[in-house]
Amino acid sequence: MFAGLPSLTHEQQQKAVERIQELMAQGMSSGQAIALVAEELRANHSGERIVARFEDEDE
């Protein structure tokens, strides 16, 4: 479970995707780009936060 994840609007999500794609076009790996954008979102987000739980369905 992850606490304190930013709750993003569709527009904010779209901008994050575009930023990730931009970083990848500049040669960054997808994992690095996602991590960087996630860090930026956490640092700059001032809205609501959600609690998310991710489970592996293979178990």
Swiss-Prot record:
**Pfam families attached to this UniProt entry:** UPF0181
Which residues constitute the signal peptide according to the record?
none
Q: Which family does it belong to?
A: Belongs to the UPF0181 family.
Protein name as it appears in the record:
UPF0181 protein YoaH
